[in-house]
């Protein structure tokens, strides 16, 4: 979970609340030789190139593509963790990014204390966390362990606590990157149902996941990325079929999204 900065945000929520991306590009410098002191050793790597997308209020958009396609970079830009190198982004409402669960947790603090610490990092107020405390603890199913030091938790327990914090806070847009394999099968089902509740209540979700079954069950539309470019946006089933075709071919034409 990362704190999110808002880019051109409008907190007076409009009926047509959207995420609007126009010609978004993001580059990183790559070191091409071992000697880090020579400027010529750097070359630009474009993680995203001219990506334009709209996400409407209450829509669930799936971002799909092969490893290295640019999915995580795009989600980080939407959540405000990264700024684009080029292009324009408008995000209406409070966006929360659900990435590495439990970032900022302190092992010497109890689960209860970490709720307030992690919540503050995300940007929640102390009053909001107090009001949501019981809901967070109940959703996590940690029971008496909530008052034990986090250092005594298993990895699964830490992930459950991190997920429980984020899904019980107030937000308009939730950005989720590959973090739904939390806990056992029953808890994962519970997490999926909470996301379905968000969908039914009109929240906006942007999600990436390697499970195309989950993407098909949850998403209204998909956007297919490859080598940082948008190949397709539209119908979920059609997009997944194009993704599978991409996996099965060595070469794929990179052109404008349909």
Predicted regions: what they are:
Residues 13-49, 236-257:
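Pre-NBD coupling/linker segments of ABC/ABC-like ATPases
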Residues 64-66:
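The feature captures the beta-strand-to-loop junction immediately N-terminal to the Walker
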Residues 116, 128-145:
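Conserved ABC ATPase "signature" region
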Residues 209-210:
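H-loop/switch region of ABC-family ATPase nucleotide-binding domains
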Residues 215-217:
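A short, surface-exposed alpha-helical micro-motif characterized by mixed small hydrophobic
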Residues 227-228, 243:
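Conserved ABC ATPase "signature" C-loop
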